[in-house]
Amino acid sequence: MSDTHIIAGMHSVRTALKHGADGVSQVWVEARRRDKKIRDIVALSKSAGILLHQVDRSELDTIAPGVNHQGAVAQVEVPAALGERDLEGLLHNTTNPPLLLILDGVQDPHNLGACLRSADAAGVLAVIAPKDRSVGLTPTACKVASGAAESVPFIQVTNLVRTIRWLQSDGVWVVGAAGEAETSLYQTDLNGPLALVMGGEEKGMRRLTREACDLLVKLPMLGSVESLNVSVASGICLFEANRQRMNR
């Protein structure tokens, strides 16, 4: 039996129904609400043949305790990770310069979930991670992702350096974030096909991953702390890339 998790909130439930309805096993909505957002969720659930419960708000509070569920909750299967062939298909079928996020050694499911959420907001084509020494899609990661685990392809690869080399041969520029780099993120042209590489919580990028990057950049740190959480740093890098692309 597949692992399942609970997602809550209008946007999260609607995203799961639109992008991964096959993995949604049941949906609960607040019975007394009749607004358009609830009607959309009800319609999407019924059209996909998903078990739908219209219940009191107190029951939603029990299913998703301590969460601002906004009157909508769903039980969702943990999505299966994709592989190298799926990445090739995604890359060759996109019409815009791809933006990819590579996570090397992220082991905390909360961080993975937060990175997926940032990736979704930034329009990332896929999130890539190695199979070894990295967390995969878990119920916790999916819960933190708030629907992004269903909308952003998560690719697990056997050999990360080999995947980076393949991306480079296909015209993707690979930029890694490293505190000791001399070049600032804000001095770097991030237009065009791009993969941003972020290291794990403790040791950052592994040596071979670092050496495989086309360029290493740093996030200027103006305070007393030396580094940022990987999900925060990922969001900063992704949205700087988007800022540059929007201003072209």
Regions inferred by a protein language model and the residue ranges of each:
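Structured adenosyl-cofactor binding patch, chiefly the S-adenosyl-L-methionine
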Residues: 121, 140-148, 207-248
